[in-house]
A protein has these predicted regions:
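A generic, lipid-embedded transmembrane alpha helix
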Residues: 20-34
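Context-gated lysine
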Residues: 23, 40, 80-82, 226-231
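Juxtamembrane helix-loop-helix connectors linking adjacent transmembrane helices
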Residues: 4-18, 34-106, 110-157
Length: 239
C-alpha cells in the first residue's frame, strides 16, 4: 500500500489511469447508444484549448503553493526515499503530467457525460424527486459556493448540465480521499474540482489539463524537494 503519490512507480500510475479511463469510456459509449439525446452539452466542443484560461487559473495555482507550504510546515512532507533526488524530481514531473491529462479526461469529460445521461433516467424512476433535489437545494448551494462563476452552466442550461457537474465532482473528490483522509482534504478537492470544471467549460478541456498538471507539479515538486533521499550503495561481489 502506497502512502503518497510519489511512491507509486510512473508505469503503475499510467496503468491505473488507463484502466479507469477505458472503463469510463466504455460506459459512456454504451449510454450514448441508448440515450444520446440526453447529452445536453456538445462534448466535442470541450476538446479545445485557450491559453488565456491559464492566466485565469492563477487562484488554484496560488492555492497549490499555499497548500504545499502548509504541508511542509506541518511535517507532512518529511519523508524518506531510497532513490536519488533527480529520479524523484523527474517522477514528480511525469506523474503531474499524467494526473492532469487523465483526471481531466476521466472526471471533467467522461464522468460528466455519464452523469448527464444517467440523471434523467434516475429522475424518471424517482418520479421527479432527483431533479427537484438538484434544482431546489444542490444547484443553488453550488451557485453560492462558487460565487456565481458557474451560473451559465448550473442555473441557465438544461438541469442535467448543472446536475452533471455536481454529480461528477464528488467522484473526483472520492478518488482523492487517500491523499489526506480528512475533511479539509475533501473540501480542498471539491473546490479545486469545481474550478477545473469552470476552466474546462469556459476555456476547454486541454486548458484544464495543463492547469491541473501545473497544480500537481507544485505539490509534488515541493514534496520531492523536501523529502530526504537516502542513497543506497550497490553491493559488489568479492573478486
Amino acid at each position: 500500500m502506497y502512502r503518497n503519490t510519489l511512491e507509486i512507480p510512473a508505469l503503475d500510475v499510467s496503468v491505473i489511469y488507463i484502466a479507469q479511463a477505458f472503463k469510463a469510456a466504455v460506459i459512456l459509449g454504451l449510454l450514448c447508444l441508448l440515450g444520446f439525446e440526453y447529452l445536453k452539452w456538445d462534448m466535442l466542443s470541450l476538446i479545445t484549448w485557450n491559453p488565456y484560461g491559464l492566466l485565469m487559473a492563477w487562484p488554484i495555482l496560488l492555492w497549490a503553493a499555499a497548500w504545499a507550504g502548509a504541508n511542509t510546515m506541518t511535517g507532512r512532507y518529511d519523508q524518506k526515499f531510497k532513490e536519488a533526488r533527480t529520479r524523484i524530481l523527474s517522477r514528480a514531473v511525469w506523474t503531474s503530467i499524467q494526473i492532469g491529462f487523465w483526471e481531466e479526461l476521466i472526471y471533467r469529460y467522461l464522468s460528466f457525460g455519464i452523469a448527464m445521461i444517467l440523471l434523467p433516467f434516475i429522475d424518471w424512476i424517482t418520479r421527479g424527486v432527483v431533479r427537484w433535489i438538484f434544482e431546489s437545494f444542490l444547484m443553488p448551494a453550488t451557485h453560492l459556493m462558487t460565487f456565481g462563476a458557474l451560473e451559465g452552466q448550473i442555473l441557465t442550461t438544461p438541469w442535467t448540465v448543472g446536475a452533471g457537474i455536481i454529480t461528477a465532482n464528488p467522484v473526483f473528490v472520492a478518488a482523492h480521499v487517500y491523499t489526506g483522509h480528512s475533511i479539509i482534504s475533501c473540501v480542498n478537492a471539491w473546490f479545486v474540482g469545481l474550478v477545473l470544471f469552470w476552466l474546462a467549460l469556459h476555456y476547454g478541456l486541454i486548458t484544464s489539463m495543463v492547469a491541473h498538471s501545473v497544480y500537481d507539479a507544485v505539490l509534488l515538486l515541493t514534496q520531492a524537494l523536501k523529502a530526504k533521499c537516502v542513497k543506497t550503495r550497490s553491493r559488489r561481489l568479492p573478486v
